[in-house]
């Protein structure tokens, strides 16, 4: 006779996506009827995000080092096509934002405010910051979550250990597996964490402050939805020659939803790693491409930079030609790739892009202030697009290289997981 599963067993073996949806709905209900109670449970969200941020650096370090150290000479990692997809997707996102902003121009009511941050003086400063992050102290890189530095040191250690004894390589492999199990445990608490995040955010900010920027938000979110559901599928189809939507929807569901509420690409790295494992992608590939994508794959950031820059341009009545618009797309794409090297991320790169049109810095910083006001939606959607695209492009490159039937593979994996969940229940 099969023993009746306990409540904890049902929680651990249940559908994570369904539990997250329940957490979202419960958070909305609690914040609507009892804001005070909602604020009191917001610590669950902060605790969850902190746990993800804590485990992400060490996860990336040991996985990358282990993958490279144990890599066979004939192994193909497919990193080059993935990086090309990252850059292509970011450039397409910026170009799409230019076109949408041209057909649906946005004007802003600027308000004077004091932003306690200093934007970079130019693209060279952004690149300079990234270069210094590469040679950061390894301990400081782990403590501060500097994933560029972590990748550099992990790769260096991995290459150095390729000549080590097999026992040393096996020990490193065992450590990476142990950290991965810890990550799986943390991710199982995503429903509770997202419940706290939703309840706390709605209770604290509400959406009243966003009503004055509905057109701006519509343009921003419209661009991001267009990239997620039209442009990315076209790119994936061009790479795999298979139906891209099973992969697209699964990544949006299992990566994008979590990223939307954590609002942190770094915190979502463990979630993406777990999803890549479910998709049965090559571990040597995704252990490097996912943390790299969290650093340079910034389609959402390029959209934010472009849309808000052109909103400032339209507000001031500045005319621009197609050549300047193309240049803005390139600058926004390059700047977005360096957004992780700037405190404040994509918003503080807006003055850099505004400089192309001669927009005064005072006006540019007022646009940045508006960005912070709408950040509860803008930043969430931006992170969801950025993070889910990391898995999408990694999977597309892997499927193309191995000539796997992408759509059939995703559907088969989902069917097997459903049967496994049903059997456990």
UniProtKB/Swiss-Prot annotation:
GO terms for molecular function: neutral L-amino acid:sodium symporter activity. Belongs to the dicarboxylate/amino acid:cation symporter (DAACS) (TC 2.A.23) family. It comes from the Bacteria. One of its GO terms (biological process) is threonine transport. InterPro entries: Na-dicarboxylate_symporter, Na:dicarbo_symporter_sf, Ser_Thr_transp_SstT. It catalyses: L-serine(in) + Na(+)(in) = L-serine(out) + Na(+)(out); L-threonine(in) + Na(+)(in) = L-threonine(out) + Na(+)(out). This is Serine/threonine transporter SstT. Keywords: Amino-acid transport, Cell inner membrane, Cell membrane, Membrane, Symport, Transmembrane, Transmembrane helix, Transport. The keyword Cell membrane applies. It is a multi-pass membrane protein. GO terms for cellular component: plasma membrane.
